[in-house]
């Protein structure tokens, strides 16, 4: 990529995601009690303060302390460093792909900050009704970092699929 602004500007999103994630978590910890529920949109969306000692859906919460540190701190840290390195080395990424990757990085580093500095676990607080889909009445509680990881991950996946379709059409014509 020739334009340095297009190359480095997406890291601003990484910083914004980290700030939004940490500020929302600080507010939840300061103004809510653990397990407190505050309805936001009826029963559809609640604020529910919980600490998550596992990964997504609390996976790994029952692991021993050393296993949790390796699987939930060390490995994610290495993956985020590898993703950052791939971003910095690749000239093939599109502008959109760079923004999506930086959103994922922001969410990943936001949750890692909790794992490093909150012994209780990652602060989760967004609780959404799931209407019994997949046998779940409510989706597992999550946070702003998780939202950015999922939304940017989906955006990146869709972008890569569309790019592949476009390249195939160009190759076939």
UniProtKB/Swiss-Prot annotation:
The active site is at 124, 146. Pathway: Protein modification; lipoprotein biosynthesis (signal peptide cleavage). One of its GO terms (molecular function) is aspartic-type endopeptidase activity. GO terms for biological process: proteolysis. Keywords: Aspartyl protease, Cell inner membrane, Cell membrane, Hydrolase, Membrane, Protease, Transmembrane, Transmembrane helix. It is a multi-pass membrane protein. This protein specifically catalyzes the removal of signal peptides from prolipoproteins. Belongs to the peptidase A8 family. This is Lipoprotein signal peptidase. The gene is lspA.
């Amino acid at each position: 990529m020739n334009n340095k602004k297009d190359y480095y500007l997406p890291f601003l999103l990484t910083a914004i995601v980290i700030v939004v994630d940490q500020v929302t978590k600080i507010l939840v910890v300061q103004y809510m009690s653990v397990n407190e529920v505050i309805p936001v949109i009826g029963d559809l969306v609640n604020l529910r303060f919980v600490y998550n000692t596992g990964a997504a859906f609390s996976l790994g919460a029952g692991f021993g302390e050393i296993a949790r540190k390796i699987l939930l701190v060390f490995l994610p840290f290495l993956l985020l460093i590898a993703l950052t390195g791939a971003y910095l080395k690749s000239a093939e990424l599109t502008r959109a792909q760079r923004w999506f990757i930086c959103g994922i990085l922001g969410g990943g580093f936001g949750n890692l900050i909790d794992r490093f500095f909150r012994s209780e676990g990652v602060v989760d607080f967004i609780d959404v009704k799931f209407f019994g889909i997949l046998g779940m009445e409510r989706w597992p509680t999550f946070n702003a970092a998780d939202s950015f990881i999922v939304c940017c991950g989906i955006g990146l996946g869709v972008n890569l699929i569309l790019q592949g379709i476009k390249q195939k059409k160009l190759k076939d014509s």
